[in-house]
Amino acid sequence: MKGLIIGLASFGLTSAAAVSSLAQPVARRGCLVSDEGAIQDPAIQYTEKTVRRQNFPSNFTVDVNFHLASTEEEADLITDEIVDAQWKVLHEAFARYDINLVLNSTERTVDNLTGSAFLINEGPDKGWVYHEEEYNTYLKATRKGGYDALNLYFFSSYSPGATGYCQWPTPLAETDELTFWKDSCQLSAMTMPGFTAEQGAFESWNLGHLAVHESGHWFGLNHTFAGGCSEPGDFVSDTPAQLTQIFGCPEGSDSCPNQPGLDPIHNYMGYTDDACTNEFTPGQKDRMFSTFFNFRRK
């Protein structure tokens, strides 16, 4: 799959449009980041050239800020042990690709609206109501660091069935204040390692790999199934084409038999089980470096 793709907003898909899907709870795992697979933009060609032309450092360091939001009933749910386990998974996953994540801060908020990710079921008349104004105010008060700082928000009660969402890197953050403040990843705490099924953990996605997946979007990676079997797919040349979302861990799966390679079921940017995912490709590493230094740290 050839080419590169950058920001959500730069493709005419605003962050508000993507987040609004929170108002419609889904039935199974759902990363709420849209599939940009078929969308073209001048930034693609620009970044494809720079990844060949520029000499990026062999490694780089990124400050990470954890934000833990719980409802009053679930105030003690996200324990320090769970946070430590999640951090270990996240740090080790990216360290293998010469991206050194440093935990800069961890802060907790106990509040029913915040802990519910600002999505409340207000009864049969109103249904699910997304409190966007309060959400924006919360982000402005809590987001830390510059545009090159990764802020991860874990919510004890998230949109039912959804697992997470993350912002793409975009040049709009340089001129639009709200785009900057919204630059973050949000996740269901039930994807963190250490929760049990009785506590509400996702059965197949509770080893902490969702934080790796969403952070991959923050670094500019698309889903492996973006674009299906057609070029340019996910805009990374060494990830085999994949027709659609794949669940479980079906070894030998080949949903695009006329394209080289088997389905990349072990890639962090797919939807297979946490126990199945363990890698990025060299091309994905190159793309993370390129998008980071072209859009996040110039």
Task: Name each model-derived stretch.
Residues M1-Q24:
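Fungal secretory targeting signals
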Residues V19-D148, F155-S156, F293-R296:
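Propeptide-to-catalytic entry region of secreted or membrane-anchored zinc metalloproteases
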Residues A69-E72, E107-V110, S156-G161, T191-G194, ...:
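Solvent-exposed loop/turn segments at secondary-structure junctions
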